[in-house]
From Swiss-Prot:
Belongs to the MscL family. The lineage of its organism: Bacteria, Pseudomonadati, Chlorobiota, Chlorobiia, Chlorobiales. GO terms for cellular component: plasma membrane. Signal peptide: none annotated. Homopentamer. Disulfide bonds: none annotated. The gene is mscL. This is Large-conductance mechanosensitive channel. Keywords: Cell inner membrane, Cell membrane, Ion channel, Ion transport, Membrane, Transmembrane, Transmembrane helix, Transport. Pfam families: MscL. PROSITE patterns: MSCL. It comes from Pelodictyon phaeoclathratiforme (strain DSM 5477 / BU-1). The keyword Transcription does not apply. It is a multi-pass membrane protein. Channel that opens in response to stretch forces in the membrane lipid bilayer. May participate in the regulation of osmotic pressure changes within the cell.
Amino acid sequence: MLKEFKEFAMKGNVVDMAVGIIVGGAFGTIVNTLVSQVLMPPLGLLIGGVDFTNLYLILKEGSKAAAPYAALADATAAGAVTVNYGLFLNSVISFLIMAFAVFLLVKAINMLRREEKAPPLAPTTKECPYCLSIVPLKATRCSSCTSELGK
């Protein structure tokens, strides 16, 4: 059984998948940092200095302190029940950037993999000049109208 597992684990597809998962995880960290540290601060300034991570809706005030809360962390510490749509926006933007980056990567790989198209095959049929039926190239008579065909 150990031998079978080793054969399975060493197949090309399994190893490729494992490498893809590891690289994907590292790439996800890079994209998350790009979104949270590079893209979101200027975007927040454009919409009035809002930090998306602190965008939330209070469903129920906390028992430890009353609203308003300065930040999501304060609301959470006070025990408030919140809908954190700012964190959701960060996740959506992060996903879109990740998806676009993967699209560009796949597109680049596909451009490198393009194979030359095979030359078109020589024709194996021809058209009868009398009835316009398709007949084999080597035929001397049309099977539809029985006309003699020139070579």
